A protein has these predicted regions:
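A small/polar active-site loop signature that marks catalytic segments
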Residues: 1-86
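C-terminal soluble interaction/assembly domains
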Residues: 52-196
Length: 196
């Protein structure tokens, strides 16, 4: 038996950097079709056609995800985590705090720690996405999805960050209750003997 960091810590680390290292394992467990079926199962019937996955790395031209389906999937994930005494900060990066794709984004003085989210990028002039959540005192958690296509990635990110800055100002957001765990999430696994 191997002992490693908890699964949530590993998932968080992988999501911080948008790492696809588990794609080969996922392929053996049913691949994109299995993930597509799971995603569609938690969506209302009318949204199910809005999720089509051709692969697990975002490179297949058949991949399709609508912004409203992305928001609904994030909302479902949030509710599942809440039911287990967790929240989105346990599995997704917090902008301006966690290392990775959101560390240097959405990090102004009134923005740091107020957005948890997931990025996605394909090519330099292909696709760029930001799906996230913002805690507010008046509206609860507000979810958003920004999916850009055929826009240079730096420009898409600039537009996404600007949209989020306006959203934060309009919603009078509050920071997530979050303290970054500085221990390495991915470290050498320990071999544990099962015999007494």
């Amino acid at each position: 038996m191997h002992r490693s960091q908890p699964l949530l810590a590993l998932a968080k680390s992988l999501n911080d950097y948008s790492n696809n290292i588990f794609k080969p394992l996922a392929d053996q467990a049913g691949g994109a079709l299995a993930v597509q079926q799971l995603a569609r199962a938690v969506l209302p019937e009318s949204m199910r056609p809005e999720v089509t996955l051709g692969d697990g790395a975002g490179t297949d031209p058949r991949n399709r995800l609508s912004p409203r389906a992305a928001v609904r999937l994030l909302e479902v994930l949030d509710h599942e985590l809440t039911a287990q005494g967790r929240n989105l900060t346990d599995i997704l990066p917090v902008a301006g705090i966690d290392p990775g794709t959101l560390q240097k984004r959405i990090n102004g003085p009134h923005e740091v720690g107020r957005v948890v989210g997931k990025t996605g990028t394909f090519g330099d002039y292909g696709a760029s996405a930001l799906v996230g959540a913002v805690p507010t005192s008046d509206h609860g958690t507000v979810y958003f999805a920004i999916l850009n296509h055929n826009v240079p990635v730096p420009e898409a990110r600039r537009r996404q960050d600007r949209f989020v800055a306006v959203l934060l100002g309009q919603l009078h957001s509050s920071p997530w209750k979050y303290e970054r765990d500085s221990r390495p999430a991915v470290q050498r696994a320990e071999l544990v003997s099962l015999s007494p």
